[in-house]
């Protein structure tokens, strides 16, 4: 029984020692990896067997020049940028523009904002638009619009390209517009005169009807007085405005 106990005790001690020895070299950080422990991407150049040395083989003479083999250094990996490194100002940097391919790839990329014309004259910066840009466009004689298309206007440089028939058309259109304006003014005046005359006749007719009604009412109320006053009223109407009013002796 004692031997069995000693045996188990020795096994337990031995297992503890083994576990302790294994745990000394165990590190959880090894599972996460480290950039410093990565192997270098560039391999050391191999030794040239033709180089001079005790164990090197002899180089055979050749007529062709031997080009040295030089390996380009490995390009560093681009650093991954997060949202904290995002900056809108990078869009205004001309170095970040994507260049096109071909001989005309750099044409038009003048200053920030690009937009250079085909004549090679660079425009001003996109945020500094000035009057010089408009003057350059006005002095550009390379643009010639197609005949019969677009507007008829043009700068002084294109005056010789105009058709004489166009000037006649302009004069005809101007005369037509003037005549139309005069005719419309006369028509409006006639319409106003006719409407005024009609309104005057309506008022005159209304007054005459009112006077006749008043006279009929007076005759119906006092026929004797009306008969006595009618000659005086007729005489008053026949007299001029400067005449003296009739007296009682002259009244009939």
UniProtKB/Swiss-Prot annotation:
Disulfides per UniProt: none
Biased composition (Basic and acidic residues): 96-120
Residue span of region Disordered: 30-170
One Pfam family cited in the UniProt record for this chain: CD99L2
GO biological process, one term: cell adhesion
Signal peptide residue numbers: 1-23
InterPro entries: CD99L2 (IPR022078)
Biased composition annotated in UniProt, kind: Low complexity: 57-68
GO cellular component: anchoring junction; plasma membrane
Keyword field: Cell adhesion, Cell junction, Cell membrane, Membrane, Signal, Transmembrane, Transmembrane helix
Primary residence: membrane
Membrane-protein topology: Single-pass type I membrane protein
Superkingdom to which the source organism belongs: Eukaryota
Compartment annotation: Cell membrane; Cell junction
TM spans (from-to): 178-198
Family statement: Belongs to the CD99 family.
Known function: May function as a homophilic adhesion molecule.
Protein name (database record): CD99 antigen-like protein 2
């Amino acid at each position: 029984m004692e031997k069995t106990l000693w045996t188990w005790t020795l096994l337990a001690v031995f297992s503890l020692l083994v576990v302790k020895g294994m745990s000394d070299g165990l590190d959880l950080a090894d599972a996460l990896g480290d950039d410093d422990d990565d192997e270098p991407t560039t391999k050391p150049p191999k030794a040239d067997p033709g180089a001079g040395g005790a164990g090197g083989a002899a180089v055979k003479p050749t007529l062709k020049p031997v080009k040295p083999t030089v390996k380009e250094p490995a390009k560093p990996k681009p650093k991954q940028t997060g949202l904290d490194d995002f900056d809108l100002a990078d869009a205004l940097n001309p170095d970040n523009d994507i260049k096109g391919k071909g001989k005309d790839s750099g044409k038009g990329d003048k200053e920030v904002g690009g937009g250079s014309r085909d004549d090679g004259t660079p425009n001003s910066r996109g945020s500094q638009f000035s009057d010089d840009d408009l003057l350059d466009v006005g002095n550009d004689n390379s643009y010639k619009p197609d005949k019969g298309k677009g507007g008829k206007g043009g700068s002084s440089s294109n005056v010789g390209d105009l058709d004489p028939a166009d000037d006649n058309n302009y004069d005809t259109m101007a005369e037509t517009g003037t005549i139309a304006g005069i005719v419309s003014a006369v028509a409006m005046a006639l319409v106003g005169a006719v409407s005024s005359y009609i309104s005057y006749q309506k008022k005159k007719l209304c007054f005459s009807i009112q006077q006749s009604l008043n006279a009929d009412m007076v005759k119906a109320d006092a026929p004797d007085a009306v008969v006595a006053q009618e000659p005086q009223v007729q005489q008053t109407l026949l007299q001029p405005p400067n005449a003296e009013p009739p007296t009682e002796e002259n009244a009939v």
